[in-house]
Each structure stands twice: as C-alpha cells, then as structure tokens.
Amino acid sequence: MDLRTGEYITAHQATSGVYTFGITNPLYFTITRHNQNPFNNKYNTLTFQIRFNHNLRKELGIHKCFLNFHIWTTLQSPTGHFLRVFKYQVCKYLNNLGVISLNNVVRAVDYVLFHVFERTIDVTENHEIKFNFY
C-alpha cells in the first residue's frame, strides 16, 4: 500500500523493474535490531531493513522504499556475518534474474531465508513505500 495515498500498489508498479547492470549498488542493507535468545528461548530475532538506492528509486518512480523484515531463527552466527552473507545471496539472486523490482526483491529475500539459510522459523515483512505523484 502506498503510504502517502493509501492506495494499493498495482501489479504494474510491483513488477516494473530495472536491469541490474544499469545501476551500481541498488540496495542498502542494515540491521536495525538483534535480540539474542529473548526470554531464554532457543531462537534469535533479527530486524533488518532494505532500502532502495536513489538511482533505483528514480528509475522506478518511487519516492521512498523501505522494506523491513523481522526474522525468527535458530542460527547463532554473528550479526555482521549474517548480514554479509544475506546481502551477497540476495544480490546474487537478483543478478541471476537480471532485473530489480519490488516483487523480485521480496522473492529474493524469501528464497535466501527459506532455501539458502537453514533454521529460519518465521519472517514478517512490513514496508514504507511512497510513489511519485508527478
């Protein structure tokens, strides 16, 4: 849903994309929170954010695009190592597709978390997306 207008994102907006070779460093990854063994459970929770680069947003007609993911996992790896491997695998998936779009980024995250990484329990996603009016 567009955060500004409240309208749903159309299929055309979600699937329109840009070739990966046309833009350098299209995505910015950051870990916003990491809880190790909350309430003495056997899992960790990670919250990370994927932001679209200015050039990618300009090509797609997006004013703002933040994809926030909250992950429950039993992996015990350090957060820096997790982020580095996650970023590499997502970029590798997108390079193999050749096109970056909203749907492809969400598919890449789903593929990496559930097929590349083992022991992912659950993932929730929320987003802040604003499309350009003009």
UniProtKB/Swiss-Prot annotation:
InterPro entries the record matches: Gemini_AL3
Keywords tagged on the record: Host-virus interaction
Domain of life: Viruses
Any one GO BP annotation for this protein: viral process
Coiled-coil stretches: none
Cited Pfam families: Gemini_AL3
Family: Belongs to the geminiviridae replication enhancer protein family.
Cited function: Increases viral DNA accumulation. Enhances infectivity and symptom expression.
Record's subunit section: Homooligomer. Interacts with the replication-associated protein (REP). Interacts with host proliferating cell nuclear antigen (PCNA). Interacts with host retinoblastoma-related protein 1 (RBR1), and may thereby deregulate the host cell cycle. Oligomerization and interaction with PCNA are necessary for optimal replication enhancement.
Name of protein: Replication enhancer protein
Organism: Tomato yellow leaf curl Sardinia virus
